[in-house]
Amino acid sequence: MSYPDKLVAGINFDGHGLAQSINAMQMDMNIMGIFGENIIGFDKVGYQRKDAVISSFAEYIGSNALSYNVDNQVGRLLMTENPLDLALSEKGYFQILNSNGTIELTRDGRFKINKAGELLTLDNQKVLSSTGNPIILPFVPKELNHISIGLDGKVGVFDAEKRGLVSAGYIGVVSEDGSQVQGNCVRQGYIESSNVTLEREYAEMANYQKSFSANRQMFKIQNNNLSTAISSLGRV
């Protein structure tokens, strides 16, 4: 949208500057929203913070210039000693099957088993193996500590009669593009805290709050100029 530089003789108005201030305030608010999500995600198991990315064409495409990258650095591992709690010590994701048949990636490894021996998330989504199939234990043990999950993700259940482990496949660990992650990165009895540092998020948010205040002040000045120009036109 274009604005005239001069509404009437002797009265100048920068319409482009007004539009820029509006876009800048919207951008600041959207970026602060990303930092807000990170702050909310601080206490979420396996949450990965987001970094705001601003396009070099922000001046021309407004709020559409904002996107984000996911920070895939590994968070701190916390011991729980729960045999069904798993964490990944390297970059990668567990695969879970949603009720609609789609596959979702997560680093939240708080799992459980149902009566059928299926390994599930806390939301009852099925955990997938390295072959892409749901992991099902050959039988449900009386004690959870009879379930063994190795560093390589191999799942086994101790059979007292056979005096050995009965295999139930491997935990599927994949990269963001879905390719298998090789390595010994599965930690049984641990969960991963988020990789959010609150001090960093609050500091970044404070910077954009200052930017928002500056852009709002500029908007007020330009808006007052517009009001003055319109009033002057009424007297012509």
Which functions belong to the PLM regions below?
Residues 1-236:
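Amphipathic alpha-helical polymerization modules
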